[in-house]
């Protein structure tokens, strides 16, 4: 009664197989991309940092360890992408996750947009089907560290929302959508309009009572899977391994038949129970293959058909004899129902485990194994190490040998040509696997072990152009052409980057140029204005202002102008100017000199002073006797003119006396004497001696003429007047030169201790273009009160006794009389004493004056 299925499938059934489903992993939940030959990893890649990419049109996804408990504290994610314009439908087949009120402990989410949750489920109730609105979805599974359950198992299918035609193993919904045939009448609305469940209600209506007929004692009632009506079957069909009832009533609660064996040969074959008939529900078989050789074992499934209803049936293949999840090579399910399937081990041992649920059954599988390099007795070697093929595979248009030996030299084709199929169409070797179909059925591009030059060999034995590799498009169908691609920047990006860098560089140069220009303008503006000195610079450059003339007099550093001593009224101005000239040369007074003439000698400075007509002062030494000298009294002009003339006279005393008489006569109203000739003195000594002698004579005679008083004249010594005058002049000149030499020597050693006048001279800046030096010294009004006999003092010491009124003349013979003030550098210490002279310095001064001025007392 049971219907037997043919061992060979028709071409129509083969072409109508379910669209290359992706196999789910039993125990580990690992997934792999589906193609004609699918390799599934033993360890899931979904439970990691990145989601597992799935591109197959359909498949099964299970939680890690299903149907056993899933691990604690895991996070798994899957990303399913369909073709553009398609939608994805998910149908849950088993679901058992720890439940909570808001599903915040263990949960499963489905998202159309990343990180935007649209579906969350937990608990033990199977969720309703999920239909996406986009061509991609994210599936995420999370578990905490508490309770673990069995997990979930779901199937997905992708297709367009409306198809004109569906495959023979698919069901067309009322809205035009196609779903797998197995989803019909499963109490799940995968169509979206419940059209896949409406027809089931009509078919499930039990027949009327009249349709039932009583069965004999050795029979049982069964809803035939073939006629779909209740019938009576003999008891012998129960638990025979063959399903006769639609509801599997004849094979439920039966003992599982013993299956599986230990295979120890280099080659062999095995199959599922009752093959090619349906295997019994609940079958659990294991085959251990141990060839005793270290070489690889090649396992081929020539026929494979499993049931996918309920929990699903599966076949697991392990590398080795132990059931080690880490050595899992492949998991085959109902979605791998195509042949041939090939699995290669890494050693000479393989473990094959087959498990079926008790819900439904299918035809099963047929498999062969052999050591790498050996062929089965009924196979023909391909040559070398290229494998084997059978006689049925000869000239069938499909390459079973990598070198094409099973398809070469066929009767319908010429030499070195290969048939497209058994219809007589052939093609040359150069057209094989070049990604260009020359056969109507495309057999020249199938099962390509090698590709023509310029093509890339995909993992699913397809060939694509090399230029299509790493172009961000899946051309192989399994994504192998986009794996391990280097990060190559497109030419457009490089061009844009170069142009952008050039523009940025140009802008940078312009910015730098503008910055430099602004900086130069800023610095130019800063140089155009005077900036204030910093505090440190101001402290370094700050100099103390020199004291005023009044402060110097008040402090006693310099004497008043009235204190300069003179021998006669006519001689006062000349002697004062001469003393100041010598003092300025020695550094004791402030005289402003031009820069070019400061290195001149002392005598050029003395005789090069010009008279200033605007200052009211006297020139130092004038060679012009007729020059008018301003004064406060007109009676003093003849005396001063006479003094000027006598400074330049080098004649005898008689000549001087005669000249004095002329001057006196002219002064008293007589006839004016002729002007004397301008004879310049030969030396400064003669000028100095002449000035002293003339001043003495003028003072004596002027006293008789003006005052009318009798003055006792001093008798000259026995020596001749000329010799006495020369001796006195030489003595005074010697003393002056000795004073100058001493002062010059002391000035170099006490340069750091200069007088205030010298400091004043250094601190005052004058005009560099002044050629003349003026010495503004007022003329004393008390010249008539001076003692005419006080001309015996040294030349450089004449102003020491000048005071506010009449002062006692200095007498060298009376050392008890101490002058109150003394100008000029001290002979002992080299310092100018403008106030009281110390006793130590006074003793040395008195001693020198006593010894040096004895010859000068003749005046």
UniProtKB/Swiss-Prot annotation:
It is a single-pass type I membrane protein. Its main location: membrane. Keywords: Coated pit, Disulfide bond, Endocytosis, Glycoprotein, Membrane, Receptor, Repeat, Signal, Transmembrane, Transmembrane helix. SMART domains: CUB, LDLa. Residues 514-859 are cytoplasmic. Residues 748-757, 802-814 have a biased composition (Polar residues). This is Low-density lipoprotein receptor-related protein 12.
């Amino acid at each position: 009664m049971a219907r037997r299925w043919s061992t060979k499938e028709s071409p129509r059934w083969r072409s109508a197989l379910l669209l290359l489903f992706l196999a789910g992993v039993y125990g580990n939940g690992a997934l792999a991309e589906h193609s004609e030959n699918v390799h599934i990893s033993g360890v899931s890649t979904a439970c990691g940092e990145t989601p597992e990419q799935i591109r197959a049109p359909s498949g099964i996804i299970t939680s890690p360890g299903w149907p056993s408990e899933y691990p604690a504290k895991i996070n798994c994610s899957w990303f399913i992408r369909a073709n553009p314009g398609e939608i994805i439908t998910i149908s849950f087949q088993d679901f058992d996750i720890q439940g909570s009120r808001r599903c915040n402990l263990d949960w499963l989410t489905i998202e159309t947009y990343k990180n935007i949750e649209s579906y969350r489920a937990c608990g033990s109730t199977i969720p309703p089907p999920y239909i996406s609105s986009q061509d991609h979805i994210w599936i995420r599974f999370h578990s905490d560290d508490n309770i673990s359950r069995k997990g979930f198992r779901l199937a997905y299918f992708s297709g367009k929302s409306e198809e004109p035609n569906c495959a023979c193993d698919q069901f067309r919904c009322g809205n035009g959508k196609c779903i797998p045939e197995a989803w019909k009448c499963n109490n799940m609305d995968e169509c979206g309009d419940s059209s896949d469940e409406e027809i089931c209600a009509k078919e499930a209506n039990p027949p009327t009572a009249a349709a039932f007929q009583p069965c004999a004692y050795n029979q049982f009632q069964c809803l035939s899977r073939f006629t779909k009506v209740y019938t009576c079957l003999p008891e012998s069909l129960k638990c025979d391994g063959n399903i006769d009832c639609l509801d599997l009533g004849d094979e439920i609660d039966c003992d599982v038949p013993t299956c599986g064996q230990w295979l120890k040969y280099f080659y062999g074959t095995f199959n599922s129970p009752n093959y090619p008939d349906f295997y019994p529900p609940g079958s659990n078989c294991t085959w251990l293959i141990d060839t005793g050789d270290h070489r690889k074992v090649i396992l081929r499934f020539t026929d494979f058909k499993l049931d996918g209803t309920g929990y699903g049936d599966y076949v697991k293949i392990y590398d080795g004899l132990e059931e080690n999840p880490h050595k899992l090579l492949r998991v085959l399910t109902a979605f791998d129902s195509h042949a041939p399937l090939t699995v290669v081990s890494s050693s000479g041992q393989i473990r094959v485990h087959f498990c079926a649920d008790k819900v439904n059954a299918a035809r099963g599988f047929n498999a062969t194994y052999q050591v790498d390099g050996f062929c089965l007795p009924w196979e023909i070697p391909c040559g070398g190490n290229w494998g084997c093929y059978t006689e049925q595979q000869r000239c069938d248009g499909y390459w079973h040998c990598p070198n094409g030996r099973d398809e070469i030299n066929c009767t319908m084709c010429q030499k070195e040509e290969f048939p497209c199929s058994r219809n007589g169409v052939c093609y040359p070797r150069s057209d094989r696997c070049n990604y260009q179909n020359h056969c109507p059925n495309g057999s020249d591009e199938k099962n390509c072990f090698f590709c023509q030059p310029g093509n890339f060999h995909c993992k699913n034995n397809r060939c694509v152009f090399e230029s299509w590799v790493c172009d961000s498009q899946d051309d192989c169908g399994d994504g192998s052409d986009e794996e391990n691609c280097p990060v190559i920047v497109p030419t457009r990006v490089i061009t844009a980057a170069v142009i952008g860098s050039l523009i940025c560089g140009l802008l940078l140069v312009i910015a730098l140029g503008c910055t430099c220009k602004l900086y130069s303008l800023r610095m130019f503006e800063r140089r155009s204005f005077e900036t204030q000195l910093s505090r440190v610079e101001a402290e370094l450059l700050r100099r103390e202002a020199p004291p005023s003339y009044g402060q110097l007099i008040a402090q006693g550093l310099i004497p008043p102008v009235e204190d300069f001593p003179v021998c006669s009224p006519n001689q006062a101005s000349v002697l004062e100017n001469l003393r100041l000239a010598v003092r300025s040369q020695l550094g004791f007074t402030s005289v402003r000199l031009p820069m070019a003439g400061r290195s001149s000698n002392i005598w050029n400075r003395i005789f090069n002073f010009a008279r200033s007509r605007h200052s009211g002062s006297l020139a130092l030494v004038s060679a012009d006797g007729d020059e008018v000298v301003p004064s406060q009294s007109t009676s003093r002009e003849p005396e001063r003119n006479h003094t000027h003339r006598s400074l330049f006279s080098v004649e005898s005393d008689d000549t001087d006396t005669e000249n004095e008489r002329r001057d006196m006569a002219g002064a008293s109203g007589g006839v004016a004497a002729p002007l004397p000739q301008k004879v310049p003195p030969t030396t400064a000594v003669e000028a100095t001696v002449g000035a002293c002698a003339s001043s003495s004579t003028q003072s004596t005679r002027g006293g008789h003429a003006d005052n009318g008083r009798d003055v006792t004249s001093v008798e000259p010594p026995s020596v001749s007047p000329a010799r006495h005058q020369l001796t006195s002049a030489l003595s005074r000149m010697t003393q002056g030169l000795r004073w100058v030499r001493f002062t010059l020597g002391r000035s170099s050693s006490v340069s750091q201790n200069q007088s205030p006048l010298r400091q004043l001279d250094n601190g005052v800046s004058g005009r560099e273009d002044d050629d003349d030096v003026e010495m503004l010294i007022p003329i004393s009004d008390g010249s008539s009160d001076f003692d005419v006999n006080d001309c015996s003092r040294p030349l450089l010491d004449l102003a020491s006794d000048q005071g506010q009124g009449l002062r006692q003349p200095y007498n060298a013979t009376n050392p008890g009389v101490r002058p109150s003030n003394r100008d000029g550098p001290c002979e002992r210490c080299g310092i100018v004493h403008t106030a009281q002279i110390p006793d130590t310095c006074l003793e040395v001064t008195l001693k020198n004056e006593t010894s040096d001025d004895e010859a000068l007392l003749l005046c």
